[in-house]
């Protein structure tokens, strides 16, 4: 998981002309990287703990989109994410917005729009597993980035499910109508 998130952060750190201040971009990349490191450092939550967790919880975190197999990413975007997990109903929902990044080596700037989770389920593979679709449209710097196919799989981490991580290394976006393969990673902490 850390590698997928690192790709988007590296793509952002190497950007050139920017409509945002260097400090704003540095802060987002740092927050993203720090949250990723914290979640990656936690052990997998046991299925018994997830099954016994009552009620609902809100997780705050980040969603990153990037092209991990290229020297210079064509897409490198990071957004803030809010997720709601209902442990009783075995569902997860949420959205990512407030994206910052670059597309096709363009300027680093804010991207409007949001990406939304759909069909979010807990316990599909094991009691600890998470699955969800994600789609939506982001616009900025004259570009339209439409996430058309992301099937996220993940897990809870930490002794009391204080974190979660989901990834799709084979997601599809359309950038100004052209198909691009990207990796999508979602992390959250409560």
Predicted regions and their residues:
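Sec-dependent bacterial lipoprotein signal peptides
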Residues: 1-15
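Mature soluble binding/inhibitory domains
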Residues: 15-190
